[in-house]
UniProtKB/Swiss-Prot annotation:
GO terms for cellular component: extracellular region. Gene3D superfamilies: RlpA-like domain. It is found in: Secreted, Cell wall. Residues 26-147 form the Barwin domain. Disulfide bonds join 54-86, 75-109, 89-145. This is Pathogenesis-related protein PR-4B. One of its GO terms (molecular function) is RNA nuclease activity. Keywords: Cell wall, Disulfide bond, Pathogenesis-related protein, Plant defense, Secreted, Signal. InterPro entries: Barwin_CS, Barwin_dom, PR4, RlpA-like_sf. It holds the Pfam family Barwin. It comes from the Eukaryota. Induction: By TMV infection. It comes from Nicotiana tabacum (Common tobacco).
């Protein structure tokens, strides 16, 4: 009986370790973030009109879903890629000011970080340095979108 309990304990610890490693892999620090002129409010939050990569899977989601969060393209160093990232949410923090915003991944990019909608970029750029430099340095973590 004791052997069975030890086995169960080992399995439980292994599962917890794997889950913690997965959670750690779902965030990144000191990531370069640029901006993109999606301006979804001007195109009725239409992913097809924005030519967003995720339109194939998410364009027919309800309007409330598409406008709940600001948009971003994702090509960060940690987290799922391609279709697996579509519709997921990130909490993005400007490392210079601590300002945070939650965004929804609607597109992919190639800059190795994030390409935030200009509205979100401006919301995070509270000291104006991002605009001056053409990019922000941010941390991000995948979060529940609560949809």
């Amino acid at each position: 009986m004791e052997r069975v309990n030890n086995y169960k304990l080992c399995v439980a610890l292994l599962i917890m370790s794997v889950m913690m490693a997965m959670a750690a892999a779902q965030s990144a620090t000191n990531v370069r973030s640029t901006y993109h002129l999606y301006n979804p409010q001007n195109i009725n939050w239409d992913l097809r009109a924005a030519s967003a990569f995720c339109a194939t899977w998410d364009a027919d989601k309800p309007l409330a879903w598409r406008q709940k969060y600001g948009w971003t393209a994702f090509c960060g160093p940690a987290g799922p890629r391609g279709q697996d990232s579509c519709g997921r949410c990130l909490r993005v923090t400007n490392t210079g000011t601590g300002t945070q915003a939650t965004v929804r991944i609607v597109d992919q990019c190639s800059n190795g970080g994030l390409d935030l909608d200009v509205n979100v970029f401006n919301q995070l750029d509270t000291n104006g340095l991002g605009y001056q430099q053409g990019h922000l340095i941010v941390n991000y973590e995948f979060v529940n979108c609560n949809d």
